[in-house]
Design a protein with these regions (language model features):
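Pre-Walker A (pre-P-loop) alpha-helix and adjacent loop at the N terminus of AAA/AAA+ ATPase modules
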Residues: 11-54
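Conserved alpha-helical scaffold flanking the Walker A/P-loop in AAA+ ATPase domains
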Residues: 38-41, 95-118
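Conserved NTP-binding/hydrolysis module of P-loop NTPases
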Residues: 81-100
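Walker A/P-loop
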Residues: 40-82
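Canonical AAA+ ATPase core
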Residues: 96-101, 117, 122-130, 138-212
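Conserved C-terminal "switch" segment of AAA+ ATPases
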Residues: 4-15, 28-29, 182-255, 276-277
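C-terminal helical "lid" subdomain and adjoining coupling/linker elements of P-loop NTPases
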Residues: 227-229, 243-314
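Terminal-proximal interaction/regulatory segments of ATP-powered molecular machines
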Residues: 299-535
Length: 535
């Protein structure tokens, strides 16, 4: 690449360079993209990472790859044991300084105090002398050498272990500083396992400087991250999650105020490196990798964040409740119409003959169609198993046959209006003796007798007005759903959230949109259907 092109690429905004950087870092790694994304975000925001998982799953390789993200970064890596000494981590003592000046100084070149990227494997096996000094280094980014304090240039600390710190081990303070906690396991997918076996296992030696992170811009970003806004709606979601954690996991997952503050800064960094100047709901999903303490709390937190992605992030639960409210109003209106218009049988005062059951369908006011009577289905429905797509609006029955019908489960011969094909229809009465026909799904569809006298306009008009109002309310909800979905679409090109989590949000919008469209269609059909019941 010509020098000028390389320089132009290096100066490109970081959110444009990061996809290339992540792609380069992940080359040859399988099912480790989430760990790389989260590790890089922690590196970019100056936080620490804890990798938890069994041996031999590329924890150290990920740490080495993350080191390559920084241009000319100094790297320190060490495998802790119970016998590790501070000299092996922080540098040996200077014999010369001790002899000549009587000073207790360490030679730190090549050791942790002068490294930008640090990887400490089997971290919990280190002794108290190492861990106490490390805790100070993480907290203050300072290292005391002799009688003076020296700044530590550490940008990223990656620790790893195949176990969690034991309870009451005195390691809680250090563990609390490991903000990003990543659970790793063996490669699971067959194709990835095959590709891993076929690969040579060689890691990158170098990345082009054009995609790497340079020291001066890294320092600038730290100030810009702090200027990212946290909108009130996102704060409310955070507070809601905090309340939920306190109520459900208070005994197994204590989250300190310091940890909350650092986690919020991490999501601000996520917003910044995605090219935004304020936090978005999707950024909050990163809490799933910051707030758990052990395996049980991790599982519970994942369930909470799954619920968050489906219900809360983009007001899905609020819109679902509004949709349910509209459904209830529509259901009540349909019940009101059915009670007023549905043909109602009555009990006979006395009866004769073997078939009499004391029930009579009043047909005296039926509009005359020769020897036939017409019934409108209050809601058009599929009644013919041979043609399930065809919706029947009106059924025709022989008056004489209908007058001898009784509700014993026997089918009655009839046919759809305009279709000479006879069918057998199962009529039923509800508890209030209102007449219904069973559709193919055996749902009860109210039947409205076509009478001589039309339905009074004073009866139809309020129903029409109520349906018009329902349509308007559904339209407002549809606009809000569209607004929230557009907001999500602007956010979903996310560098640090896996596709699985984005799909959950997408699925929730799909269900909401589908159900709302169906409700609007049903209301519109009823709005058009009511005047036809007089035909």
């Amino acid at each position: 690449m010509p020098p000028l092109a390389s320089q132009n690429l290096r100066l490109a905004p970081i959110h444009e360079r990061l996809p290339r950087l992540l792609s380069a870092l992940g080359e040859g790694l399988y099912e480790r993209q989430d760990a790389l994304r989260l590790g890089l975000l922690a590196a970019l925001s100056g936080e620490s990472v804890f990798l938890l998982g069994p041996p031999g799953i590329a924890k150290s390789l990920i740490a080495r790859r993350l080191k390559l993200a920084f241009h000319e970064a100094r790297h320190f890596e060490y495998l802790m044991t119970r016998f590790s000494t501070p000299e092996e981590v922080f540098g040996p003592l200077s014999i010369q300084a001790l002899k000549e000046d009587g000073k207790y100084l360490r030679l730190t070149a090549g050791y942790l105090p002068e490294a930008e990227v640090v990887f400490l494997d089997e971290i919990w096996k280190a002794g108290p002398a190492i861990l106490n000094t490390l805790l100070t280094a993480i907290n203050e980014r300072q290292f005391r050498n002799g009688d003076s304090q020296h700044p530590i240039p550490m940008r990223l600390l990656v620790t790893a272990s195949n176990e969690l710190p034991a309870p009451d081990s005195g390691l809680e303070a250090l563990y609390d500083r490991m903000l990003v906690r990543i659970w790793m396991d063996r490669v699971q997918e067959k194709a990835n396992f095959q590709a891993m076996l076929a690969s040579d296992g060689q890691s990158h030696q170098n990345l082009p400087p054009s995609v790497q992170i340079h020291g001066e811009e890294y320092l600038e970003w730290q100030e810009q991250i702090d200027r990212v806004r946290l909108p009130d709606d996102c704060f409310e979601l955070i507070y809601q999650l905090r309340q939920q954690l306190d109520s459900q996991l208070a005994h197994s997952c204590y989250v300190s105020d310091r940890r909350w503050k650092k986690a919020v800064r991490l999501i601000k960094a996520s917003a910044f490196f995605n090219g935004r100047d304020e936090v978005a709901p999707l950024d909050l999903l990163l809490f799933k990798d910051c707030l758990w303490h052990d395996e049980a709390s991790r599982t519970a937190l994942l369930e909470m964040m799954t619920e968050f992605s489906r219900l809360y992030g983009y007001q899905q639960l609020t819109m679902t409740r509004q949709l349910m409210g509209l459904r209830d109003k529509f259901k009540q209106l349909k019940q009101s119409v059915a009670q007023r218009l549905c043909c109602k049988a009555r009990k006979r005062q006395q009866w004769f003959g073997r078939r009499a059951r004391g029930i009579q369908i009043p047909l005296a006011n039926a509009r005359p169609f020769g020897k036939l009577v017409h019934f409108h289905l209050l809601t058009p429905a599929a009644l013919d198993g041979d043609d399930p797509e065809r919706l029947v609006e009106t059924l025709v029955f022989d008056r004489t046959l209908l007058s001898h019908w009784h509700p014993t489960g026997e089918s009655l011969v009839g046919w759809p209006l305009g279709n000479p094909k006879e069918g057998h229809y199962e009529l039923v009465l509800d508890d209030e003796l209102r007449l219904h026909v069973l559709d193919l799904q055996r749902q009860q569809i109210p039947l409205v007798l076509v009478e001589r006298t039309p339905i009074p306009e004073v009866v139809i008009t309020p129903w029409q007005a109520a349906l018009t109002e329902l349509l308007a309310e559904a339209g407002v909800l549809a606009q809000e759903l569209k607004r929230q979905r557009n907001l999500f679409e602007r956010h979903q090109q996310h560098l640090f959230i896996g596709r699985h989590w984005l799909q959950q949000v997408e699925d929730s919008f799909f269900v909401l949109n589908r159900d709302l469209d169906q409700l609007r269609t049903d209301i519109s059909q009823w709005h058009d259907r009511l005047p036809q019941l007089d035909a």
